[in-house]
Amino acid sequence: MSLLRTQALKKHFGDTHAVDGVDFTVNQGEFLSLVGTNGAGKTTLVNLISAFLLPDSGSIFIQDRDITYSSVEERIRAGIARSFQLVNLFDDLSVLDNVALSIFAREGKTRRILVPAERDVAVMREAAELLEQFGIGAKAQACARDLAQGERKLLDVAVAYALRPKLLFLDEPTSGVSTRDKAQIMDTVSSVVRGGRITAVVIEHDMDVVFKYSDRVVVMHEGRFLADGPPEDIRRNSDVAKYLLGTDV
């Protein structure tokens, strides 16, 4: 069953057709990877779906509800959340408070994080449990700025996950980390997301990661979809080999 659908979605920047008439469907429960070379349109597509950009034309639906021109806040309430390629944390807050702030925002009680006496015990407990799920529970009281890069990536995903989304976008969750940290991040994220029955769309450049963890892979090229299918089909696709992998099948 489809959770998200775009119809003839377009976004142009001058002569650059960043997203050029894209019809995109994300099915409930998928762990989907969105791949392509730099400038292919991946991040622009996610920015359109998460309301960081408005489309020039086309439509966006979540569970058949038209959200094309709704705000970021309205899309969060509709069940869309995301993490960022450049980690977007409150560095002066503790690791625990970063997650708690996301939970308070979900509950419409953001200001309470600034008043320790008003902090809800249940919220802080939920935040602590989420950190354990993501493997960084031991760092709960540490300042976010003091985390290692891999830990910061996990915290960024945990902050988005704390919103209890139906659809979670992860923008290059393994960029800038070691091979060992990539495996730890993806093992953890895949386990938590699948365990929570969350639908995930991951922008990723490392094709080893893509082929190992994805149910489905969508390849973008010059603002359009070049290929769409299970990992084994994408591996054998001659167009993908030419434009993305730089090889011939």
Annotate the PLM regions:
Residues 2-249:
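Glycine-rich phosphate-binding loops of nucleotide-dependent enzymes
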